[in-house]
Amino acid sequence: MQESIACGKTVLGKQFIGVVAALAFSSGMCAQTAPPQQPEPAKSQKAAPAPRRDLSGIWDVANTMEGISPQGVKSHAPFTAWGADIANNVYKPGDGPRRVLIGRVNDPLDSCDPAGFPRNLLFELRPFQVVQTPNQVLMLYQYQRVWRVIWTDGRELPKDPDPRWYGYSIGRWADDYTFLVETVGLDERTWLDNAGDPHSSELRVEERYVRVDHDTVELTVKIDDPKAYTDPWLARDKLHLMLQPAKTDILEMICAPTEAEAYKKAIADPATK
């Protein structure tokens, strides 16, 4: 029987309806039940030197649970009044310090909305592939089977971009081993993480990828959103990514609307009664 991955759960064809009656469809449960893919250990004690200006390949987080981050970011800057109102009164997460009962959760992921950026870096960061072209860097993610385009042709960020789920990104090499990415134009409907931490349309995200050696990259993600937070802060700080063998098969982790509806009828709706 063909096996697929749906929202982080292993689903065997029509057996899903029975499974969903026993397992919560919430994003937190998806994170906990997804089959872990442990990065393969390096074949040698000392990795080869890093290639210059090259992130090509398939990468995975060295510590799987650190990549999944089911309870949200470890810490963040204080909320502004606007950010606190959204976090405490509007968003109803199923995980983290402000989690609510399952029948009250309004996480967009439970309706199969896109995770968006940077949530796809802060929750369920699974294997992803980097493809470099002369004018772009493409990042292809396992979770929700989505991709990002990072322009490297020297263009500037747009001044007033239309909001996008994954924003508008430009990148450049700060040196031979450090790739910097800036992203703006992010849709306010997305959450930052599983804990329902919000962001506004003023959000600016900076990513720093440092190629330490042939097999290792350190990822740092900086959040700068003056409407939602009092100060810029680091959502990821030197997260270790490991290069995977070229034969690695990136799985499907797709949220199917039919499965989300089945979960809603079997679990979420009865929980509100």
Where on the chain are the PLM-derived regions?
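A general, composition-driven signal for non-globular sequence regions
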Residues: 8-9, 26, 47
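PEST-like low-complexity, intrinsically disordered acidic/proline/serine-rich tracts
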Residues: 2-3, 18, 30-273
